[in-house]
Regions:
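Charged, glycine-interspersed solvent-exposed loop segments at helix/strand-loop junctions
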Residues: 130
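An acidic/histidine-cluster motif and surrounding catalytic segment
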Residues: 1-127, 137-173
């Protein structure tokens, strides 16, 4: 994909583990900043990833995204506070604005991603990339929880975007 076509991205990548224990070391190695940047930018500019609810040619020309990698305690607390679900989930998306600048926070729970990747026999980096794409699509207005049509559309778009990033279809792996 043409790098010049990418929108301006202001990215804050946060690792919520002040103790820097060894469990997070593997995650830091699996998810370098350039991989996060590429996944988000590729999602935003994908030809089919138009911003939902806007004109047919509506795209983000700039984005301000915070990606925070958390432990299970913080992941569960955020999920409880904002979704009334008392467990840590793999990704939470807090979308603030679609236009003129796409603005969102993506929270990924490291232990949940590690467990899911191991259970599903997936590469940890590929699983992170999948959930970054998934969370970015949520920030762009896509939803899979309220209709089967929306879920099918979002899943198909994820697969196309991931293919462009060199990641195998996570729903067939």
């Amino acid at each position: 994909m043409n790098l010049q076509a990418y929108p301006e991205l202001t990215l804050s990548l946060q690792w919520a583990n002040p103790r820097k224990d060894t469990a997070f070391t593997a995650h830091r190695l699996a998810l370098p900043r350039h991989a996060v940047t590429r996944a988000i930018k590729h999602t935003i500019v994908h030809p089919l990833a138009l911003i939902k609810g806007h004109q047919a040619n509506s795209r983000a020309h700039a984005a301000e995204i915070t990606v925070r990698i958390v432990d299970a305690v913080e992941g569960q607390a955020l999920n409880r506070q904002y979704r009334a679900k008392d467990y840590a989930t793999n990704v939470l998306t807090f979308d603030y604005a679609l236009s003129p600048v796409l603005s969102a926070d993506l929270v990924l729970c490291a232990p949940v991603l590690a467990r899911e990747a191991a259970e599903q026999g997936k590469d940890l980096r590929a699983h992170y990339i999948h959930l970054l794409v998934h969370g970015t699509l949520h920030a762009m207005g896509y939803d899979h929880e309220h209709s089967q049509t929306g879920a099918a559309r979002m899943e198909a778009l994820e697969v196309l975007i991931l293919q462009g990033l060199g990641v195998v279809n996570p729903y067939e792996a």
